[in-house]
């Protein structure tokens, strides 16, 4: 589109063309008042992306304020590219999780790949070297041809990008439920390490300083990507494929290394990724944070397509681009660094003192907007909230299953895609590149050593969205608690949280109620577990033709292993070790894998959780691990104790377990009661372990390669470990190969 063909401000208003960009009538009227005139086409587009939910959090901001964001280790909370936490020795860890759901539903390979690329840039824009990637994925049932296609292409996209950049993908989770049939979730997390003195911020300060553009040239891909991410998916969404960006991981690698070198150059003032809303968001946000203004000459923006308009250049979300602010007169120093990597750093503007975003094109001013109106003063909506009818109904329902054949039930649960081995997924990822990975994918948390120290980092992503659906507040608490449980089982102290809040349309009161209650639960858990929220992302409008996903607040958590000797895994270690269970089982089957397998649906009450009990048990276990008396540790989660035991023996080689159950055997084996751990201990450490931890001994590790469970001196389950392993490992590959 040429400038001559762009609609006039009057046409935009009279024909309500702004609605197609995602703006409401009231918002357009606000823009008129802010500018004191009608906005032109470029300005309307700029407001539309910056006031989208994806960029402004206009629907979720009142809820997000509930999160605790400060703590003794926090160096940088929400508001920058990533949060940062101190880990001692002058080092810090930077991390963040973000969604790329809508693009992945339309073009799964590039949608997932560019999600990885974007989160990597968020971390290295802070000055941190990315050391690990994780992801949290949700798909519909794996029996659907469409779901198989999305699953295979999303995993390929994550692998293709991460492997090429050379950052190990070390962990994550994949779950399958019909609620995600039309709207998969692709949440990507990146973790980086940084020295305190190298921390950068995305600010445009210093009047007269130069604004520089670095990285890939600007094309028309991703235009209105932020707006696209702020609306429901429909049958027409497939036509918006151009809104999905295309990534180049080799360019990303060069950009990463160049940016990590340039942070040591005194000429650099600030640096930010051109992510959602591209050049618009990076320039406006950097100026707003600094209390300055910014002028850009769009004729100087590197373009890979001819005839691009200001609207297209400002709204493009082409990947692998960074915006830098550099001290005036020292541009050559910056250019020399990037030139070493075959990259061009180009001056495209300057910092001003008038708090305006001013754009020039062909010698004319084509946009003039107050930066705070874009970056800080978007409208904020306090949406109505209403408890859904299903929730009241579920609170009155009791579900107590009957199990006739324990072996058949365990093998059936191990074959459920959500529980089954994800080896098919993570074997496509290079999780050992850079050789720092100590605990690879498949355990409670991934663990990476920190070179030059005796410390290590544990990291995980977690959320059982079924629990959040049944009871958002309780489910929110459990999401935080389970993440911390996984960190502790690895021998680490939980430090902080990054979250990705994936929900449906917030304009529906029942959906907003889910969001509000989930955040209430998460916030309470974060306060009690002392894990502040330091970064995150909100992804709303996850609906397909009016049907919402399960509310899915993904929790990314990082913990510190004070000494590598404390690193613990779930695998049983040697015959004769004693097996303990921490925590008692209750008849809690709402949202459980057993309920889904037996009934084909999810209903009833979510498991309860006492956060003070949770903290006490985690602290006791971590103390025992640090005392060197724990051989293995694993949390009891999906599928209950039976599945947890199976995972402990399947993770070992040639070992088995003999366990005695007492009380309600179905609840003991298959209930998903919270705050429970399965631990193995050497016999010589028995007394010290029992002094440190309240736990019940239930059996011991054997060398016969079977899982043997008795109740009242009667064998109720006797399964060869190899049989379990074959079912568990083969489930997902078999489903992918099956013809529907």
Swiss-Prot record:
Enzymatic class: ligase
Catalytic residues (positions): 54, 100 (proton acceptor)
Location within or outside the cell: Cytoplasm
Top-level taxonomic group: Bacteria
Residues binding Mg(2+) 2: 122, 273
Reactions accelerated catalytically: N(2)-formyl-N(1)-(5-phospho-beta-D-ribosyl)glycinamide + L-glutamine + ATP + H2O = 2-formamido-N(1)-(5-O-phospho-beta-D-ribosyl)acetamidine + L-glutamate + ADP + phosphate + H(+)
Binding site for Mg(2+) 1: 98, 537
Main location: cytoplasm
Binding-site list for substrate: 99-102, 121, 245, 317-319, 539
Protein's UniProt keywords contain Ligase: yes
Binding site for ATP: 57, 96, 499, 536
Summary of the function given for this chain in its UniProt record: Part of the phosphoribosylformylglycinamidine synthase complex involved in the purines biosynthetic pathway. Catalyzes the ATP-dependent conversion of formylglycinamide ribonucleotide (FGAR) and glutamine to yield formylglycinamidine ribonucleotide (FGAM) and glutamate. The FGAM synthase complex is composed of three subunits. PurQ produces an ammonia molecule by converting glutamine to glutamate. PurL transfers the ammonia molecule to FGAR to form FGAM in an ATP-dependent manner.
Name of this chain's protein: Phosphoribosylformylglycinamidine synthase subunit PurL
Species name: Anoxybacillus flavithermus (strain DSM 21510 / WK1)
Gene coding for it: purL
């Amino acid at each position: 589109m040429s400038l001559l063909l762009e609609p006039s401000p009057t046409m935009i208003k009279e024909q309500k063309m702004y609605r197609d960009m995602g703006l409401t009538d009231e918002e357009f009227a606000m823009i008129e008042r802010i500018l004191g005139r009608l906005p032109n086409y470029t300005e309307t587009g700029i407001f539309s992306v910056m006031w989208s939910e994806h960029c402004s959090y206009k629907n979720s901001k009142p809820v997000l304020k509930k999160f605790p964001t400060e703590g003794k280790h926090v160096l940088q909370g929400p508001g920058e590219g990533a949060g940062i936490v101190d880990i001692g020795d002058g080092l810090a860890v930077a991390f963040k999780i973000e969604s790329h759901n809508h693009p992945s539903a339309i073009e799964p390979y590039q949608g997932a790949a560019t999600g990885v690329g974007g989160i990597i840039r968020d971390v290295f824009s802070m000055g941190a070297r990315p050391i690990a990637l994780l992801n949290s994925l949700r798909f519909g049932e794996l029996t659907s041809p469409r779901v198989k296609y999305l699953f295979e292409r999303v995993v390929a996209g994550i692998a293709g990008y991460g492997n090429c950049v050379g950052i190990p993908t070390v962990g994550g989770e994949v779950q399958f439920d019909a609620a995600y049939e039309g709207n998969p979730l692709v949440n990507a997390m990146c973790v980086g390490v940084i020295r305190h003195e190298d921390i950068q911020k995305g600010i445009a300060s210093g009047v007269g300083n130069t604004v520089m553009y670095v990285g890939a040239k600007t094309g028309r891909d991703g235009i209105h990507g932020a707006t696209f991410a702020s609306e429901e998916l429909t049958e027409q969404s497939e036509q918006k494929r151009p809104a999905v960006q295309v990534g180049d991981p080799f360019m990303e690698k060069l950009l990463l290394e160049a940016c990590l070198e340039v942070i040591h150059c005194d000429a650099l003032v600030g640096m930010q990724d051109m992510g959602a809303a591209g050049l618009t968001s990076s320039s406006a946000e950097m100026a707003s944070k600094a209390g300055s203004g910014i002028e850009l000459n769009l004729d100087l923006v590197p373009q890979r397509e001819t005839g691009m308009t200001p609207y297209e250049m400002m709204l493009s979300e082409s990947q692998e681009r960074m915006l830098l602010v550099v001290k005036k007169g020292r541009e050559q120093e910056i250019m020399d660094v990037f030139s070493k990597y075959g990259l061009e750093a180009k001056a495209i503007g300057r910092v001003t003192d008038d708090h305006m975003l001013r754009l020039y094109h062909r010698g004319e001013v084509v946009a003039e907007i107050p930066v705070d109106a874009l970056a800080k003063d978007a409208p904020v909506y306090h949406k109505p909230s209403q408890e859904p009818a299903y929730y009241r109904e579920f609170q009155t329902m009791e579900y107590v299953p009957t199990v006739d054949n324990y072996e058949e039930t365990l093998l059936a649960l191990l074959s459920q895609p959500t529980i089954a081995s994800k080896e098919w997924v993570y074997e496509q990822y290079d999780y050992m590149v850079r050789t720092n990975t100590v605990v690879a994918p498949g355990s409670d948390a991934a663990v990476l050593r920190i070179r030059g120290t005796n410390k290590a980092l544990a990291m995980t992503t977690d959320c059982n969205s079924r629990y959040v659906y049944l009871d958002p507040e309780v489910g929110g608490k459990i999401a935080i608690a389970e993440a911390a449980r996984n960190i502790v089982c690895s021998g680490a102290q939980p430090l902080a949280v990054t979250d990705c809040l994936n929900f449906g349309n917030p304009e529906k009161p029942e959906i907003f109620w889910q969001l509000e209650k989930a955040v209430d639960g998460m916030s309470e858990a974060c306060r009690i577990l002392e894990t502040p929220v330091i970064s995150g992302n909100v992804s709303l409008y996850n609906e397909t033709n009016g049907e919402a996903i399960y509310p899915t607040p993904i929790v990314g958590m990082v913990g510190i292993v004070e000494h590598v000797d404390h690193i613990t895994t779930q695998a049983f270690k040697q015959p004769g070790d004693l097996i303990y269970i921490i925590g008692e089982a209750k008849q809690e089957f709402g949202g459980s894998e057993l309920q889904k397998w037996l009934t084909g649906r999810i209903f009833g009450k979510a498991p309860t959780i006492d956060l003070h009990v949770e903290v006490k048990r985690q602290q006791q276990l971590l103390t025992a691990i640090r005392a060197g008396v724990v051989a293995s540790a694993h949390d009891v989660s999906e599928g209950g104790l039976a599945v947890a035991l199976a995972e402990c023996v399947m993770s070992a080689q040639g070992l088995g377990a003999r366990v005695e159950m007492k009380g309600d055997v179905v609840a003991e084996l298959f209930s998903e009661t919270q705050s429970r751990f399965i631990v193995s201990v050497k016999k010589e450490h028995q007394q010290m372990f029992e002094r440190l931890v309240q736990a019940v001994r239930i059996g011991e590790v054997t060398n016969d390669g079977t899982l043997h469970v008795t109740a009242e001196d009667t064998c109720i389950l006797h399964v060869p470990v190899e049989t379990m392993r074959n079912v568990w490992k083969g489930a997902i590959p078999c489903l992918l190969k099956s013809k529907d």
